[in-house]
């Protein structure tokens, strides 16, 4: 037992009157209640959104894709010849819609193909480049926002948690976006008196062949200060998934053991009821026991969850890379395709099974040490082109086109209620580099957190914009001169889910960058986020 000093005893005694008065009040709920509620006035019409997030693993340069400048010398930042000379796989089954052969050579021949998106915040024209051609169609492009980001973390191991959570390593509230979303929707269920839902609201889908697997697994399921029931379910895509399914059947457990555990839980729950709360529905006072109680309830429901997961698309096919500087094309297990199909399946299920948030890691077809976009010294054009094309091609085949309805639309993403978020941990040098210095002998790019891009498509976004700007200066001076932080972006994405980003478990208003941190209060901060990222 810890003994109080006289000073501590007096301090505690000064608080006792308030505490006693509180305990004498009628019983109140210690549950999550309406956690995450957005104040009125932030949205004219609150969005009813779900999020599919894709993390491009390894750090991807935006210059051939999301931030393509059409001016000579700026198009691909040193890789015009390699991009123009790429061989594109002619097989429609492998690389649907890819160019039929090498792209047009750079000037004096016709320029590399691209599509205007919008002017950035410095008034410069930004195009979607050849590697992002799957985003060119009007029903996609007109609902696309490119956000220029910047931070100062060079290692993957530090940058990935920062970008995925919006907080740096060491912060006790560092949590997956899915944790906040799951806590919010479980709070709404509880407020409505609905039974505990078997299926999670938030998932992470992590290919087994992705590099840094343990780091990704822990980050995608990071709980921070949220309730234990808010933890996203992270599933590995690959052979381990079938092992997980078999474990959900709880082999070896007996009904009598379950009954005993259920009885013991009920007894302990009764001991923890609030003063005067006799109704069975009254929540327990202990947050830790409450988390345990919900976990045990989910454990009992595991076999029914196994039945649901057995319907999840699980087929992993061997695919071929779409682009190659030198033939033959790379081949490999297309776990990204499998993960994306599973994600869309989870997001399009009817209630009460449909997910609200699914995060997918893009493990690529053309991989280097399991990090598909980590193109140090070699293969920038091949690996970035092949991997991004594979991801965007698979994704866009599962997005509805309002002008061309199909019988399969019920199982496709509807951009009116789905926000697609494409992120990466940092960018890559805006020049051919060796050891982060310009080098004409290199055919790759090194880490560059000074300027990179995230993309959001659909949801509350109705017009194309480029937020931020990357300088046109050469080499080491090509940094983001107007930029946002991963914290800004994560707060905005919670807002798109109609979740208060400034709940204590989420972000502090003052931790955001200047355009938002200076807001007079939380409501004004949310309005500023909405106006910048979604209006």
Regions found by a protein language model. Give the residues of each.
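Ligand-binding pockets and gating/stacking loops
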Residues: 2-535
């Amino acid at each position: 037992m810890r003994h109080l000093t006289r000073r501590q005893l007096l301090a505690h005694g000064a608080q006792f009157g308030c505490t006693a008065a509180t305990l004498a009040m009628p019983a109140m709920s210690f549950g999550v209640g309406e956690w995450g509620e957005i104040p009125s006035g932030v949205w004219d019409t609150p969005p009813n959104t779900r999020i599919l997030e894709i993390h491009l693993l390894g750090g991807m340069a935006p210059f051939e894709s999301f931030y393509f400048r059409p001016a000579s010398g700026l198009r691909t930042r040193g890789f015009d010849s390699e991009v123009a000379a790429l061989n594109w796989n002619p097989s429609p089954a492998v690389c649907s819609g890819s160019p039929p052969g090498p792209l047009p050579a750079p000037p004096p021949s016709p320029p590399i193909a691209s599509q205007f998106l919008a002017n950035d915040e410095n008034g410069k024209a930004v195009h979607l480049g050849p590697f992002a051609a799957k985003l060119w169609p009007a029903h996609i492009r007109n609902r696309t926002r490119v956000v220029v980001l910047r931070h100062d973390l060079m290692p993957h191991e530090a940058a990935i948690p920062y970008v995925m959570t919006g907080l740096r390593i060491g912060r006790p509230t560092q949590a997956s976006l899915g944790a906040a979303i799951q806590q919010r929707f479980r709070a709404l269920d509880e407020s409505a008196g609905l039974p505990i839902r078997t299926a999670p609201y938030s998932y992470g889908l992590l290919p087994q062949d992705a590099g840094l697997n343990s780091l990704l697994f822990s980050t995608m399921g990071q709980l921070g200060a949220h309730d234990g029931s808010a933890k996203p379910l992270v599933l590995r895509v690959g052979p381990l998934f079938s092992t997980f399914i078999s474990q959900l059947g709880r082999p070896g457990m007996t009904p009598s053991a379950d009954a005993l555990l259920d009885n013991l839980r009920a007894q302990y729950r009764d001991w923890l009821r609030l003063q005067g709360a006799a109704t069975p529905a009254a929540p327990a006072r202990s947050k830790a026991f409450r988390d345990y109680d919900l976990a045990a309830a989910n454990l009992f429901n595991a076999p029914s969850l196994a039945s649901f997961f057995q319907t999840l698309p699980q087929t992993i096919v061997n695919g071929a890379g779409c682009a190659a500087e030198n033939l033959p094309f790379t081949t490999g297990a297309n776990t990204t395709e499998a993960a994306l199909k599973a994600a869309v399946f989870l997001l399009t299920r009817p209630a009460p099974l449909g997910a609200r948030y699914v995060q997918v890691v893009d493990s690529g077809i053309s991989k280097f040490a399991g990090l598909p976009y980590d193109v140090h010294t070699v293969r920038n054009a091949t690996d970035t082109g092949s991997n991004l094309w594979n991801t965007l091609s698979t994704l866009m085949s599962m997005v509805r086109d309002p002008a061309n309805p199909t019988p399969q639309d019920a199982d496709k993403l509807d951009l009116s209620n789905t926000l697609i978020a494409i992120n990466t941990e940092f960018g890559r040098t805006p020049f051919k580099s060796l050891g982060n210095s310009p080098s004409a002998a290199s055919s790759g790019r090194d880490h560059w957190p000074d300027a990179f891009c995230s993309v959001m498509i659909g949801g509350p976004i109705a017009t194309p914009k480029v937020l931020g700007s990357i300088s046109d200066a050469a080499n080491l001076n090509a940094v983001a001169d107007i930029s946002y932080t991963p914290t800004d972006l994560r707060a905005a994405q919670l807002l798109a889910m109609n979740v208060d980003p400034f709940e204590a478990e989420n972000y502090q208003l003052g931790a955001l960058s200047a355009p938002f941190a200076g807001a007079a209060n939380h409501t004004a901060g949310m309005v500023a986020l909405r106006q910048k990222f979604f209006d």
